[in-house]
Every structure is written in C-alpha cells, then in structure tokens.
Amino acid sequence: MPFAQVSPDVKICYELFGRLEDPTLVLLHGLGSQLLLWEEGFCTGLAAQGFQVVRFDSRDSGLSTKFPEGSAYTLSGMAADVVGLLDHLEVADAHIVGFSLGGMVAQHLAFSHGTRMAHVICVMSSSGNPDLPPPDAGALAPSG
C-alpha cells in the first residue's frame, strides 16, 4: 500500500479506489480500528457510484506512524494529517465521512479547514466537548 509523508514525523498508509477525476470521498475510522474498518466491497461500491474513495490508517494505527506509548496527540494534529493527505493526493476539497473518533476529527476539519471540505458526515460521534449538555432524553427514547 502507498504511504504519504504528511508531516516531518507522520507517515500515513492509505488506499485509493475509483478514478482520480471523480469527487474524492475520505473515510476516517474510529479509535482502535484501522482502514480495514471500511471494507473493500463498501469502498468499491462507493467508487462505482462515482467517487474516488480514500481509506487510510490514522496516526498510531495500522501501518501508519506509531508513537511511543503514552505520547499525546490532538484532534488538530489528526486533522492536519488528513489535510496533509489531501495535499499529497493533490485534492482541493473532499467529502469527509468520520466514524466515532473519525467523526470528531471530521468536525475539527470542518471548523479549521472548512474550505477543503465539500461535505462532512459524522457517524456515531460527538464533539468531545464535556461542557455541552447531555442529549435530550426524548431524542433518545424509542419511537413508534
């Protein structure tokens, strides 16, 4: 699989599906998983719908750069990795789908690099802000 040097100390492993000329869709996995979370059939299906699909191992997962145990890194650093990957691929803007922690990174991308995002979709995620109120109980209640 190819790698992108997204910063002096971070190398990201990624995989592409589809045609380079199609709109780019970047898939961000959650904590404790890797690019394989996004199954190949799912990625090829999206590519068949007219997207260039990018799945990648975020820092400290899969084949990407590992950091010493206990090292801290931030959502802004992880967002910068995505921007570095887009730069490496020469992609001006992309549709971003983030799952769990990937959704938190996607939200940070939308805030800090909004012009690079065509759309942002967050799946099973939160903002990570502990100062926000809890979800409304009515919204969590079963319907029907």
Where are these regions (language model features)?
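Short, hydrophobic/aromatic-rich segments at coil-to-beta transitions
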Residues: 1-3
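Conserved HGGG/HGGXW glycine-rich cap/lid loop of the alpha/beta-hydrolase fold
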Residues: 6-68
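A structural alpha-helix within SAM-dependent methyltransferase catalytic domains
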Residues: 43, 83, 111-114
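Active-site loop/oxyanion-hole signature of alpha/beta-hydrolase fold enzymes
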Residues: 61-101
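Conserved hydrolase catalytic core segment
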Residues: 92-135
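Helical cap/lid subdomains and adjacent loops of hydrolase enzymes that gate the active-site channel
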Residues: 133-144
